[in-house]
From Swiss-Prot:
It is found in: Cytoplasm. This is 3-dehydroquinate synthase. Pathway: Metabolic intermediate biosynthesis; chorismate biosynthesis; chorismate from D-erythrose 4-phosphate and phosphoenolpyruvate: step 2/7. Pfam families: DHQ_synthase (PF01761), DHQS_C (PF24621).
Length: 359
C-alpha cells in the first residue's frame, strides 16, 4: 500500500493507494470516522458493480448506510442533482456529524464533494474514485464543482476530504476508452514533472500496457499533485500549472456536445497548446510531436475537431482562469519546464485563429 500525506492549511489527510482496498474499506474508514450515517453517492454505471460491496463493508464496520444514485454522465453535474441529493440528505435527517462517501468517477466526486461542502455548511467527505481519470486527477486536491450551460466547473468550492481510497484493481472493469482517457491526465502530470516520471511513459505503447503499470503511474501522479496542492491549495500560484491542456480542452469538450470524454479533450488541449506556443516562438516544435506520440500510443485524439476558432474563443471568455482582462495559460518550454502566460481576453480570437491556421 502507498500512503500519500496531504497537509493543507485547514486539514491533514491520507491518500491510500492499495490493490483490493475496497474489500477493506470499512476498516480504512473507521480510522478517520466514528460510527455515523453515511451517504454513499454513486451513479448508474458504478453502483451495480460496487455499491453492495461498499455498503456491506461500511455496515459491518458500524455505519448506517444510504445509497444515493445519480444518472451516469456529465449532465449530472447540475443544480438539479445538487438539489436532489440535498433533499435526500435532509429527508434522512443527516446532521453535521454524518458524512458523504463519493463512489464513482470524476462526475460523482465533483458532485458529491460539492454537496458535502454546502450541506449544513459542510459535512465530512471521503473520496473513493473508480475511474483512472478520477484516481489521478479529480479526487485529489479538494476541488468540487458543477457545470453551467456556459462552461464546465463554474460553480464549486475547495473542500478537502477526510480520506481518499484508491483501488487500482477496480480498473479492470473499465472499457479501453476510459483507461485511455485517464492516461491522458497521467501524460499531463508527467510532462509537467519530466525526469523519471516522463521516461516511464515510454513503456506504455498500447492501452493494454496501462493496467500493469497503473499502481506506479497513479502513485507518481498523485504524489505530484499532492505536492502542488500543499503548496497552493486555492490555485493562486503554481497550482495553476495543473491546468496545462485544460484551457483548449474544456472549450473543445463543451463544444463537442458530449462526443469527447474529458481526458480526450485534455489530450487534444495538450497537443494544441504546444502547437500554439510553438507558432508564437515560445516552445520548440519538437515538443508537439513528443506529446502527440505519447497520447496516440493509446489511441487518444490529438487533432482539433471541426469547430470554429471564434466559438472556442467565445467559450474561453467564461473560463474560470480569467483574471481581470486576461486568461492565464500554461505552456511548456520543454518537458518538465512549465510556465504561466496571460493572454488578454480581447486577443483570444486572434490566438485561436493563429492555432487553426497552423493546424
Amino acid at each position: 500500500m502507498t500512503n500519500i500525506e496531504v497537509k493543507t492549511r485547514v486539514k491533514q489527510y491520507q491518500i491510500k493507494i492499495m490493490i483490493n482496498s475496497l474489500h477493506h474499506l470499512g476498516t480504512l474508514v473507521t480510522k478517520v470516522w466514528c460510527a455515523r450515517q453515511v451517504a454513499v453517492v454513486t451513479d448508474t454505471n458504478v453502483g451495480p458493480y460496487y455499491a453492495k460491496l461498499v455498503t456491506d463493508e461500511l455496515t459491518a464496520a458500524g455505519f448506517k448506510v444510504r445509497v444515493m444514485t445519480v444518472p451516469a454522465g456529465e449532465e449530472s453535474k447540475s443544480w438539479s442533482q445538487v438539489q436532489s441529493l440535498i433533499d435526500q440528505l435532509s429527508a434522512a435527517h443527516f446532521s453535521r456529524s454524518d458524512g458523504v462517501l463519493a463512489l464513482g468517477g470524476g462526475v460523482v466526486g465533483d458532485l458529491a464533494g460539492f454537496v458535502a461542502s454546502i450541506y449544513m455548511r459542510g459535512i465530512a467527505l471521503i473520496q473513493v474514485p473508480t475511474s483512472l481519470l478520477a484516481q489521478v486527477d479529480s479526487s485529489v486536491g479538494g476541488k468540487t464543482a458543477i457545470d453551467l450551460p456556459t462552461g464546465k466547473n463554474l460553480v464549486g468550492s475547495f473542500y478537502q476530504p477526510d480520506l481518499v481510497v484508491i483501488d487500482p484493481a477496480i480498473l479492470v472493469t473499465l472499457p479501453p476508452r476510459m483507461l485511455a482517457e485517464g492516461y491522458g491526465e497521467i501524460v499531463k502530470c508527467a510532462a509537467l514533472v519530466g525526469g523519471d516520471f516522463w521516461q516511464s511513459l515510454h513503456q506504455i505503447t498500447s492501452v493494454a500496457a496501462i493496467l500493469p503499470a497503473a499502481p506506479d503511474l497513479i502513485a507518481a501522479s498523485v504524489a505530484f499533485k499532492a505536492r502542488v496542492v500543499m503548496a497552493d491549495e486555492h490555485e493562486q500560484g503554481q497550482r495553476q500549472l495543473l491546468n496545462f491542456g485544460h484551457t483548449i480542452g474544456h472549450a473543445v469538450e463543451l463544444l463537442a456536445d458530449g462526443q469527447l470524454m474529458h481526458g480526450e479533450a485534455v489530450a487534444i488541449g495538450l497537443v494544441q497548446v504546444c502547437r500554439l506556443f510553438a507558432a508564437h516562438g515560445l516552445a520548440p516544435t519538437s515538443l508537439t510531436s513528443t506529446l502527440k506520440a505519447r497520447l496516440m500510443a493509446v489511441g487518444l485524439p490529438t487533432e482539433l475537431p471541426p469547430i470554429a476558432p471564434q466559438a472556442v474563443a467565445a467559450v474561453m471568455q467564461h473560463d474560470k482562469k480569467v483574471h481581470g482582462t486576461a486568461l492565464t495559460w500554461v505552456y511548456l518550454s520543454a518537458v518538465g519546464q512549465p510556465h504561466l502566460y496571460p493572454i488578454a481576453v480581447t486577443d483570444l480570437a486572434t490566438w485561436m485563429g493563429d492555432l487553426w491556421s497552423v493546424s
